[in-house]
């Protein structure tokens, strides 16, 4: 459960991401594909090369979903319901992949926002991404 301090940290950190959200989302996806090659199996129709328009496009979708989650941090299950349905019933993404992408997002944010990425912010973002992952996998049951 996110504490009030966690929510404040997440909103502040995501605010610093600003107009780079899509770029950071794509970079996190590239990190995931390179670090965890089995995740590529969900994207057989994508050009997964560096800078690919498809990876950039999906990175923007990831970032937009996270922006939505930040904006609805007190009601993520409702805000992310359609996305949860999509990943559980149509795409059938293995839930472990959300943890892998979350890790890659944390690395990407730490690389781009070193001054803001304090231990407290790191912990808050980790809890937030775990909460998002939990919501996205809630309909698998």
UniProtKB/Swiss-Prot annotation:
Tissue expression notes: Red blood cells.
Cross-referenced PROSITE patterns: GLOBIN
Residues at which heme b binds: 87
Gene Ontology biological process terms, A to Z: hydrogen peroxide catabolic process
Domain named Globin: residues: 1-141
Signal peptide segment: none
Keywords: Acetylation, Heme, Iron, Metal-binding, Oxygen transport, Phosphoprotein, Transport
Protein residues bound to O2: 58
Pfam families on file: Globin
Positions carrying N6-succinyllysine: 7, 11, 16, 40
Modified residues (Phosphoserine): 3, 35, 49, 102, 124, 131, 138
Quaternary structure note: Heterotetramer of two alpha chains and two beta chains.
Role, per record: Involved in oxygen transport from the lung to the various peripheral tissues.
Name assigned to this protein: Hemoglobin subunit alpha-1/2/3
């Amino acid at each position: 459960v996110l504490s009030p301090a966690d929510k404040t940290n997440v909103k502040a950190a995501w605010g610093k991401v600003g107009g780079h959200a899509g770029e950071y989302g794509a970079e996190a996806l590239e990190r995931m594909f390179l670090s965890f090659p089995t995740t590529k199996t969900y994207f057989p129709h994508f050009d997964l090369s560096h800078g690919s328009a498809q990876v950039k496009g999906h990175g923007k979708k990831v970032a937009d979903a996270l922006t939505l989650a930040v904006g609805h941090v007190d009601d993520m299950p409702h805000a992310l319901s359609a996305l949860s349905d999509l990943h559980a019933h149509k795409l059938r993404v293995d839930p472990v992949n959300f943890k892998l992408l979350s890790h890659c997002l944390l690395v990407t944010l730490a690389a781009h926002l070193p001054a803001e990425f304090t231990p407290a912010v790191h912990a808050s973002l980790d809890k937030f991404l775990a909460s998002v992952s939990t919501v996205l996998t809630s309909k698998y049951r």
